[in-house]
Amino acid sequence: MLSIQEIMALIPHRYPFLLVDRIMELEPGVRAVGEKLVSANEPYFQGHFPGNPIMPGVLILEALAQTGAVAALSAPENAGKLVLFAGIDGARFKRVVRPGDTLRLEVQLEKMRRGVGKGQARATVADQLACEAELLFALTDPSR
């Protein structure tokens, strides 16, 4: 399990854009399972949507991407690198995510070639599928 401090040591995201609260399972370079505790205080709920708060789908995808970045960057050979989003294929949203929900974020990394990788991602709430997608990412030197 990784704490928020350990997550922040791996990825550069910070409030209000750090969307993973903890990592419960980690196989470095292979897979990660994380959680986002969705609070009524999230800044995006002010406008999405007043009186009917729903977590934007793009932020669910970003939370999945950050979980995948933790999996990739926890591998010793990727230490000190930066993970950039390179694409999304087959994204599907099956359930709304609301304040009070705990979003479970699962990412399985599949391929890595010449600094470009792919992962299968799923987000669930109470064992119900909220989102699934194939995420594409690139590993790079942060000074570039």
From Swiss-Prot:
Main location: cytoplasm
Localization, UniProt: Cytoplasm
Enzyme Commission number: 4.2.1.59
Domain of life according to the entry: Bacteria
A molecular function (GO) term: (3R)-hydroxyacyl-[acyl-carrier-protein] dehydratase activity
GO cellular component, one term: cytoplasm
Pfam families assigned to the protein according to its UniProt record, in alphabetical order: FabA
Alphabetical list of Gene3D superfamilies matching this protein: Hotdog Thioesterase
Catalytic activity as recorded in UniProt: a (3R)-hydroxyacyl-[ACP] = a (2E)-enoyl-[ACP] + H2O
GO BP term (any one): fatty acid biosynthetic process
Family of the protein in this entry: Belongs to the thioester dehydratase family. FabZ subfamily.
Name of this protein: 3-hydroxyacyl-[acyl-carrier-protein] dehydratase FabZ
Native species: Chloroflexus aurantiacus (strain ATCC 29366 / DSM 635 / J-10-fl)
